[in-house]
């Protein structure tokens, strides 16, 4: 009697509010791909947004799509042209893989390629499933002292690393991080690891600010009904001078305004959080003080640095994980994330290994 084929249980969004656990066929890797047995996948705000609204901006769910892009797993099969990986390797997955070598790839900014494959961004499937295939060049071996969960958290950490690179964070900088959600916290971690001397984190939530303090914020500032200018003054008071760098992770108009007012003349503000399409900001104030305003879109060339940070214990992402669920309870996990009950909710995809 033949052994039963393993199931490929997958979490699939069909449209706004329609989330299902379904069995998909186990994919066959192409020549430059690897088949992975998934282990840990974090829930991102974008996953919840696609479930709730069926779209993010111009990216619309038009057909069933597997969610998940913060992920790690184990190689179980390699394509014919893959040489750097073999079955048994533990890997972290970079979800954005170029489909072609276009002008952006040639200059190393493949995250800007309009044709890039990106997990769980329509129409591309993600990896919240038992088995998943991916471009082998965007799967990175994990050192023995880096856990699967840490490997999955390289994705959000990469957002923080890319933001800090775009902002030019360097030794001795004073940094303002607006927002103490997962992206604000990884930006804090990245800034400290890259040499920031002092970091202040702002948020509305006392509990989130408490977590920011736990993971390394030098100062925290709870926002209530202050004006942007008043917030900027408080930030300056905490740091002793204006921060050279502001990392704006909320996308909220008043927070962006406060960030511009707070940033030191000649400094840089990076926009990580995305809010309304049109936003009113004190542009003349920024221009006359030469405050550079830069956009941040995902990341590029960050996985090797992130792995080194984790392996050397320069950053500790473990406190970010507050809840864990097996894949079979993914719907409950998403409800937990939607209600804001957890900071980072992790789904364990391997029924035989639920360890971090």
UniProtKB/Swiss-Prot annotation:
SUPFAM superfamilies: GroES-like (SSF50129), NAD(P)-binding Rossmann-fold domains (SSF51735)
Intracellular or extracellular location(s): Mitochondrion membrane; Cell projection, Cilium, Flagellum
Residues where Zn(2+) binds: 44, 69-70
Main location: mitochondrion
EC number: 1.1.1.-, 1.1.1.14, 1.1.1.9
Effect of pH on activity: Optimum pH is about 9 for D-sorbitol oxidation, and 7.4 for D-fructose reduction.
Gene Ontology process terms (BP): flagellated sperm motility; sorbitol catabolic process
Family statement: Belongs to the zinc-containing alcohol dehydrogenase family.
Oligomer status and interactors: Homotetramer.
Xref: PANTHER family: SORBITOL DEHYDROGENASE
Protein name: Sorbitol dehydrogenase
């Amino acid at each position: 009697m033949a052994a039963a084929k393993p199931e490929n249980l997958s979490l699939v969004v069909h449209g706004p509010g329609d989330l299902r656990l379904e069995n998909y066929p186990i994919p066959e890797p192409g020549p430059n791909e690897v088949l992975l047995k998934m282990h840990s996948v974090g829930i991102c705000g974008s996953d919840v947004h696609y479930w709730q609204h069926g779209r993010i901006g111009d990216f619309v769910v038009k057909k069933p799509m597997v969610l998940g892009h913060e992920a790690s797993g184990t190689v179980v099969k390699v394509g014919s042209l893959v040489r750097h990986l073999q079955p048994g390797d533990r890997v972290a997955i970079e979800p954005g893989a170029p489909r072609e070598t276009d002008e952006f790839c040639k200059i190393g900014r493949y995250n800007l390629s309009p044709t890039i494959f990106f997990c769980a961004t329509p129409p591309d499937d993600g990896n919240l499933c038992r088995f998943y295939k991916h471009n082998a060049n965007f799967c990175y071996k994990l050192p023995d002292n880096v856990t699967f969960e840490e490997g999955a958290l390289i994705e959000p950490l990469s957002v923080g690393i890319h933001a800090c690179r775009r902002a030019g964070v360097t030794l001795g900088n004073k940094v303002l991080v607006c927002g103490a959600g997962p992206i604000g916290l990884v930006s804090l971690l990245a800034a400290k690891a890259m040499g920031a001397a002092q970091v202040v984190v702002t948020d509305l939530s006392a509990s989130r600010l408490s977590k920011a303090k736990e993971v390394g914020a030098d100062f925290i500032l709870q926002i209530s009904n202050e004006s942007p200018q008043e917030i900027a003054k408080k930030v300056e008071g905490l740091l002793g001078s204006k921060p050279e760098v502001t990392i704006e992770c909320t996308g909220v108009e008043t927070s962006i305004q406060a960030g511009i007012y707070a940033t030191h003349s000649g400094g840089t503000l990076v926009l990580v959080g995305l809010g309304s399409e049109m936003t009113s900001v004190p542009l003349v104030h920024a221009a006359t003080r030469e405050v550079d305003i830069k956009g941040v879109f995902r990341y590029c060339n960050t996985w090797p640095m992130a792995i080194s940070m984790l392996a050397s214990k320069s950053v500790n992402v473990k406190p970010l994980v507050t809840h864990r669920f097996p894949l079979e309870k993914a719907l409950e996990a998403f409800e937990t994330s939607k209600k804001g009950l957890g900071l980072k909710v992790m789904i364990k995809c391997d029924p035989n290994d639920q360890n971090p």
